[in-house]
Amino acid sequence: MNNLLLVALGGSIGAVFRYLISIFMIQVFGSSFPFGTLLVNVLGSFLMGVIYALGQMSHISPEFKALIGVGLLGALTTFSTFSNETLLLMQEGDWLKAALNVVLNLSLCLFMVYLGQQLVFSRI
């Protein structure tokens, strides 16, 4: 299958997952903090770490990378929404939540990429 079609397929799945997760998180926690965006970014970072490590250990096809790495995870995670939500919190004068959003997204996402890699590498 053409890699472009695989990216589109993965992207459509990732976008639907992001939407459903965001709606669920709003229903559970309300909308005063962007928990949905945080969750999809953290989850996507973990999965990206796993995929990267698997690629280092064995051959992962370009098609799989296009479908999952670029398509699904690219659409699941969202830096632009994170940036917009952080700016909105700042514009509302909620500097603490804005700072918390930045710190949590960056630190948790970096840690989850690392954790995903380590879980795969430790199983060698």
Curated annotation (Swiss-Prot):
**Disulphide bridges, residue numbers:** none
Give the record's keywords alphabetically: Cell inner membrane, Cell membrane, Ion channel, Ion transport, Membrane, Metal-binding, Sodium, Transmembrane, Transmembrane helix, Transport
Mind naming one GO cellular-component term on file for this protein? plasma membrane
Compartment(s): Cell inner membrane
Membrane-crossing residue ranges in chain numbering: 4-24, 35-55, 60-80, 102-122
User: For Na(+), which residues are the binding ones?
Assistant: 74, 77
Q: How is the activity of this chain controlled?
A: Na(+) is not transported, but it plays an essential structural role and its presence is essential for fluoride channel function.
- Record InterPro entries: FluC
Signal peptide stretch: none
Gene Ontology annotations of biological process type:
cellular detoxification of fluoride; fluoride transmembrane transport
One Gene Ontology MF term? fluoride transmembrane transporter activity
Q: How does it sit in the membrane?
A: Multi-pass membrane protein
Q: Which Pfam families match?
A: CRCB (PF02537)
Catalytic activity as recorded in UniProt:
fluoride(in) = fluoride(out)
Has the keyword Translocase been applied to this entry?
no
* Superkingdom of the source species: Bacteria
Q: Which family does it belong to?
A: Belongs to the fluoride channel Fluc/FEX (TC 1.A.43) family.
Matches recorded under NCBIfam families: crcB
Outline what the protein does. Fluoride-specific ion channel. Important for reducing fluoride concentration in the cell, thus reducing its toxicity.
- What name goes with this protein? Fluoride-specific ion channel FluC
Natural source organism: Shewanella oneidensis (strain ATCC 700550 / JCM 31522 / CIP 106686 / LMG 19005 / NCIMB 14063 / MR-1)
Gene of this entry = fluC
